[in-house]
Regions:
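Short hydrophobic/aromatic beta-strand immediately N-terminal to the Walker A/P-loop
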Residues: 27-29
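Short beta-strand-centered segment that lines the nucleotide-binding/catalytic pocket of NTP-utilizing
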Residues: 51-65
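Active-site signature of alpha/beta-hydrolase-fold catalytic machinery across serine-
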Residues: 44
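Conserved lysine of the Walker
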Residues: 38
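P-loop (Walker A) phosphate-binding loop of NTP-binding proteins
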Residues: 33
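Hydrophobic positions on the alpha1 helix immediately C-terminal to the Walker A/P-loop
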Residues: 41
Length: 205
């Protein structure tokens, strides 16, 4: 099981690693339970380390027409992890600029090209970011979690009337992915955001 640390300890670890002036970017991957605060933690880290870029797995959903039959019951089947790896993660890991088009589920379309300059710290955040297809391009894997009760409270606040459907559809897929690939057990570190101040007064995302 990964060692549990605080967000402050993670900041210290990253600061020490970056102070060594590594020859390649440090790629931090934040995976974990929905509502645990992965995006909130990534936002905090980018404020702490301005020379960084953030890649969101949410930008790499597959368009519905490209998803296999029965994808709703298969972990990761709604994600285009190959495109994430080839267009964004691999170039960032190699210290190259990143050019990619996010897919918007809300709009049902690809968005204009985004260009991100190479930076010494790359933060990949979102569900499925520790998938074996991506792991070879990651320096440090951190699993972000919270208690079941706190997760329910946060998701109800975030999703509102959509919570019941969200909980029935996405949480089982996510937990299946964690179990299939032993994501929580194999992470380098873990951050538990259950404590009330873990998200610094912001809604955890």
């Amino acid at each position: 099981m990964a060692q549990n640390i605080t967000p402050e300890s993670l900041i210290s670890i990253l600061a020490a690693a970056l102070a060594q002036k590594p020859t390649k970017p440090l790629v931090l991957a934040l995976d974990g339970r929905c509502g645990s605060g992965k995006t909130t933690l990534a936002d905090r880290l980018t404020r702490q380390f301005p020379a960084s870029i953030v890649l969101h797995t949410d930008d790499f959903y597959l368009p519905p027409a490209q998803r296999v039959r029965g994808w709703e019951k298969t972990p990761c089947a709604n994600m285009d992890l190959t495109r994430l790896r080839d267009e964004a993660l691999r170039p960032a890991y190699e210290g190259q600029p990143v050019l990619y088009r996010a897919y918007s589920c809300r709009a049902g379309a690809y968005q204009p090209v985004q260009e991100l300059a190479a930076q010494p710290l790359v933060i990949l955040e979102g569900s499925y970011s520790h998938h074996p297809l991506l792991a070879g391009y990651e320096t440090l894997q951190v699993f972000v979690t919270c208690s079941r009760e706190e997760q329910t409270h946060r998701l109800q606040a975030r999703e509102g009337e959509r919570y019941a459907n969200f909980s029935a559809r996405w949480i089982p897929l996510e937990e299946g992915y964690f179990a299939q690939y032993r994501i929580e057990e194999t992470a380098d570190l873990a951050v538990d955001t259950t404590a009330a101040n873990a998200c610094a007064g912001m809604m955890c995302r």
